[in-house]
Amino acid sequence: MIYAKIIQMIIRFWGTRGSVPVCSPSVLKYGGDTTCVELRSKNNDLIVIDAGTGIRDLAVSLKNEKCPESFTMMFTHSHTDHIWGFPFFFPVYRKGQKINISCCNAPCGSGKEIVSGTMRPPIFPVKFENAAADFSFSTIPPEGTEIYGIKVTPVAISHPDGGSGFRFEENGRIFVFLTDNELKYNHKDSIGFEGYAEFCRNADLLVHDAQYNDEEYKMFRTWGHSTYSQVLELAEAAEVRHVCFFHHSPDRTDAEIDTIADSCNALLRTSGKRLSCSAVYKKQEIRL
């Protein structure tokens, strides 16, 4: 598919699952692949966020259109479910392809350390140094930067080993991406619930980790993930327009996710809030 020049920010989701990829008839709607998000600027410039197993299907999509000669990849952190698709991303092996890896200074490592670590024997036969693409590496400063005309502001996530969330602003539209962020426990570098609410303030779209329900969270507190109710609380406090649940538990079926999203929307309707919510599904496209 050839995408015409667009006039708005577009977000496509290629991997929505958390922790580990899953495959069964019960997860076909929301998908079993791990985190990978495609972001397009108003001029159709490409930013890829994370390289979980969903990145392979993004590669297929890029093959079906004219893959940009140059694009940017960003990583939230270096846990395996967010990086292990990188060696299977065809542009890595495309001669003349320009890929900029842009990351924050974080305990999880530099951009080069993250991607090169996925391509080394004995865990993968092709060394990163032998990849055909032309790589460059840049650091996103704490105050943010501009990528393809999009203002990108990072924030430290509350997660074991650290990492970053991002706020993207273009043409007055705001998209905030906070995966693997534990709202009710302060890991090292966490800015706390109120800090995250301010970071998300007035976002048109907030996509946030909601791996657990309240009962599960009692067992997995400190593991670096949030619950549906906590994310709704954050979205209300931040006065966002729409919130999407993300990083679905590998044990969660489509039917269970549907039930959670429906019950959360019913709760919002009775409260009279302008906020709406949904659960992100694989290959979903959102335009801002």
Language model: regions and residue ranges:
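Residues immediately flanking
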Residues: 51, 181, 210
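Binuclear metal-dependent hydrolase catalytic cores
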Residues: 1-176, 184-187, 196-197, 254-288
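Active-site glycine-centered loops adjacent to acidic/histidine catalytic or metal-binding residues
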Residues: 77, 180, 247
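Cap/insert and terminal regions of metallo-dependent hydrolase folds
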Residues: 185-274
